[in-house]
Regions:
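Aromatic/hydrophobic pocket-lining residues that form the small-molecule binding cavity
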Residues: 28, 60, 107
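Substrate-binding cleft of secreted/luminal carbohydrate-active enzymes
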Residues: 33, 38-57, 66-67, 73-153
Length: 153
């Protein structure tokens, strides 16, 4: 952070940790809570909230709220979304395993939900090719999702 600011104070510095807070601390050994409560670490954080609303481990809305509530300084919240899951089963989601396959507007609902949070400043989509060069099997689902997303932008 300091090196970036010394080079150009206008450049924003941020990170994109996984969305599961427990994994960050206990498996990645990163102290995101400290970075979001003290100055001098980040300008923005883009947690990879690649979970659906019905995910059994990390439901989307609750996870976004947790990230927002951790911010005790001026860090901006940019929510990382996962269009690469659109049209597919999410085998790790428990009760929400078919949510991405049967959606149609899940990305739009995610953006609308995140906008309610105090520190929300935008969203990022992971992965470019899943949106602009999707596999033919999920192309109709992606197009439907993009139409829904454009309506809320």
């Amino acid at each position: 952070y300091t090196a970036v600011k010394q080079a150009d104070g206008e450049v924003l510095f941020g990170i994109s940790p996984q969305g599961n807070m427990d994994n960050n601390y206990n498996k990645q050994f990163i102290d995101v809570k400290k970075w979001l409560s003290e100055e001098g670490y980040l300008d923005y954080i883009c947690p990879q909230v690649y979970f659906g609303f019905k995910n059994s481990t990390c439901p989307y809305e609750q996870t976004v709220e947790e990230w927002n509530d951790l911010i005790k300084n001026k860090v901006q919240l940019v929510v990382g979304l996962s269009p690469y899951k659109v049209g597919l089963e999410d085998a790790y989601a428990g009760n929400g395993r078919w949510e991405w396959a049967n959606g149609g507007d899940i990305l739009a609902r995610m953006v609308e939900t995140a906008r309610k949070e105090k520190h929300y400043q935008g969203f990022a989509l992971f992965r470019y090719n899943s949106v602009f060069q999707p596999e033919s099997s999920v192309r109709p689902a992606i197009l439907e999702e993009l139409d829904s997303l454009q309506e809320v932008l």
